[in-house]
A protein has these predicted regions:
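ABC transporter nucleotide-binding domains
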Residues: 1-174
């Protein structure tokens, strides 16, 4: 089925993002657009510092405090994300409906917390499941993303995982 026949689940049109720095406005993103359709994977590529992370963080309400969307529109499931003003608003979709896997998984994982607990917290927050059932689901997620010996790995810290394994843990959390 051609994309023209379907509605995108995420549509960004002519998005502009600026940052305030020492009293000046710094334009970081100018007229950037994309459509993401159900069941598709989208990769955003570009040179280091070109704005990929800034652009995608705007979909999750995760811009730095001095950053703001200054133009264009971002629609998710037909809802205008510009109307999401508070953290409470963003928590209705962040992690539940939209997630992002960063290139460096160490920036997404707490180095002081065991891997299993981090996955459990995501399950508790996003699905409302706690205790032994959350632990069981966390172990299943580790297995599902190809982490060998999930019972042992559940008790380990991020620094005890390879980079590729950490990235799979972040995918399990997402």
């Amino acid at each position: 089925m051609a994309n023209m026949e379907r509605e995108p689940i995420l549509s960004a049109r002519d998005v502009e993002i600026s940052f305030s720095l020492r009293g000046k406005k710094l334009n970081a993103i100018r007229r950037c657009s994309l459509d993401l359709y159900q069941g598709e994977t989208l990769a955003i590529v570009g040179e280091s510092g070109s704005g990929k992370s800034v652009f995608t963080k705007s979909f999750l309400g995760m811009l730095d405090a001095n950053g703001s969307i200054t133009g264009g529109s971002i629609l998710f499931e037909g809802k205008d994300l510009a109307k999401y003003k508070t953290e409470k608003d963003w928590m209705t979709i962040r992690g539940k409906k939209i997630s992002m896997v960063m290139q460096d998984p160490m920036t997404s994982l707490n180095p002081l917390k065991k891997i299993g607990r981090q996955i459990e917290e995501s399950i508790e927050l996003n699905q409302g499941i706690k205790g032994p059932e959350a632990k069981k689901m966390a172990l299943e997620m580790l297995k599902k993303v190809g982490i060998p010996d999930p019972e042992r790995r559940y008790q380990q810290y991020p620094h005890e995982f390879s980079g590729g394994m950490r990235q799979r843990v972040v995918i399990a959390i997402a």
